[in-house]
Curated annotation (Swiss-Prot):
This is Small ribosomal subunit protein uS2c. It holds the Pfam family Ribosomal_S2. Gene3D superfamilies: Glucose-6-phosphate isomerase like protein, domain 1 (3.40.50.10490), Helix hairpin bin (1.10.287.610). InterPro entries: Ribosomal_uS2 (IPR001865), Ribosomal_uS2_bac/mit/plastid (IPR005706), Ribosomal_uS2_CS (IPR018130), Ribosomal_uS2_flav_dom_sf (IPR023591). One of its GO terms (biological process) is translation. It comes from Lolium perenne. The gene is rps2. Keywords: Chloroplast, Plastid, Ribonucleoprotein, Ribosomal protein. GO terms for molecular function: structural constituent of ribosome.
């Protein structure tokens, strides 16, 4: 894996609050190597470790993107939904930002069928086919289309399983991580002080509750993906 410089600096991470963990009573002992101190009843994350693993994650996604690999970003926390969508669109990644349905990856054949139905419905609406149907049927189809857009809109162009999955909240997206582990899909996950760093291939110790922290980490990863995509396009 190529090692590159990703302009990750401690001052920027401190300003974003990346170092703030959970209260000392809400911690996972496996996170001990990533904690540098306790302050006013709160664990403080060791940002040198954050920088190291974030850099490794950026190297991984850059190399994968430069080979034309596909990515899925998962973040269903309400406050992060818009951030997840905009970051994924910017980096041409698939994303899930509303709800993770159990079996979304492990029951891929079912997910693929739903995506096919979604694409067909969108095409029919665009071609004006709904205009020739009774109003009641149109209302039913539009409700179905709206639901599919809400929950599957971020993966509507996904035709196969992703090569790498990025998870923004380990505890909230635990099922997604388990599905990736079952399928052998490499994962990158933010891990706060109450998380298990062993659940992902690359765990980035960071505050996963504050938007500024999530945004900083995600932006670094997205920048690396975009750089990798650019290299792939130049070489092909």
């Amino acid at each position: 894996m190529t090692r590159r410089y990703w302009n990750i600096n401690l001052k920027e991470m401190v300003e974003a609050g990346v170092h703030f963990g959970h209260g000392i009573k809400k911690w996972n002992p496996k996170m001990a190597p990533y904690i540098s101190a306790k302050r006013k009843g709160t664990h403080i994350i060791n940002l040198a470790r954050t920088a190291r693993f974030l850099s490794e994650a950026c190297d991984l996604v850059f190399d994968a993107a430069s080979q034309g690999k596909s990515f899925l970003i998962v973040g269903t926390k309400k406050r992060a939904t818009d951030l997840v969508a905009s970051a994924a669109i910017r980096a041409r990644c698939h994303y899930v930002n509303k709800k993770w349905f159990s079996g979304m990856l492990t029951n891929w054949s079912i997910t693929k069928t739903r995506l096919s139905q979604f694409r067909d419905l969108r095409a029919e609406e665009k071609m004006g086919k709904f205009q020739h149907l009774p109003k009641r049927d149109v209302a039913i189809l539009k409700r179905k289309l709206s639901t599919l857009q809400r929950y599957l809109g971020g993966i509507k162009y996904m035709t196969r399983l992703p090569d790498i999955v990025i998870v923004l909240d380990q505890q909230k997206e635990y099922i997604a991580l388990r599905e990736c582990a079952i399928l052998g899909i490499p994962t990158i996950s933010l891990v706060d002080t109450n998380c298990d760093p062993d659940l992902a291939n690359i765990s980035i110790p960071a505050n996963d509750d504050t938007m500024t922290s999530i945004r900083l980490i995600l932006n670094k990863l997205v920048f690396a993906i975009c750089e990798g995509h650019s290299l792939y396009i130049r070489n092909h």
